[in-house]
Amino acid sequence: VAYIDVVQGTDLWLEYRAPLLSASVAASAAGLKGSYSSRNKCWEEYMGKKKEVTSFMQFGTDHEQDAKHDGEIAIGSLSHDVGIYIHPDHDWLGASPDGKFIGLGLHEIKCRDTEPYAGISPQHMAQIQVQLACAEEVKCVYQSWTPLEQRIWIVEYSPEYWACLFPLLEEFWEFVLSKKKPPQVRPRRVIPVEPTTTLFYEGAHDGIRA
């Protein structure tokens, strides 16, 4: 696995990440239904348009360590910090999961101030599958966290899902390289594959955060 050992959130991390199609924007890049933004908006950001930091994004940044701690208690293992994974066959594709449980898989955290997600959205599923492909892992711990409770799923890598998603990412990246604005995707696309997911935990947090 091609791997860059760098601390997430630092200027160096941003520098290494800038020339990559990141897992976090995979759904938007692919034009998927349920993605955070459109394919055109995603392309504009790669062309230099400043990305807006929403209150939801800031909430996630502010509470990620609390969430990681609660996830570790629920899983019963430490989530180790990671840098950037580069896809072994496609060096333009990268991912920075929120952590990695040794012997179990990657760790992806989503923080909310209302209630945990009831399921895994197309936006997050695309992100997870890209992370797994880049890291050559087969499972990811997906944690939907709120200050009072959480839900945690184990998500498995799906070659069938990847076979549908990857051509869409490759298509988008060609528009980035050529600096040619992509046509709008209407209606938004749907990946006709549901990767295997298992609900691992749901309920209030166990233990007390420091």
List where the protein language model places each region.
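Nucleic-acid nuclease catalytic cores
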Residues: I73-P183
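Charged, glycine-rich intrinsically disordered N-terminal tails and low-complexity linkers that flank
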Residues: V1-D66, A74, R186-A210
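Binding-site signature for planar aromatic cofactors or substrates
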Residues: H69
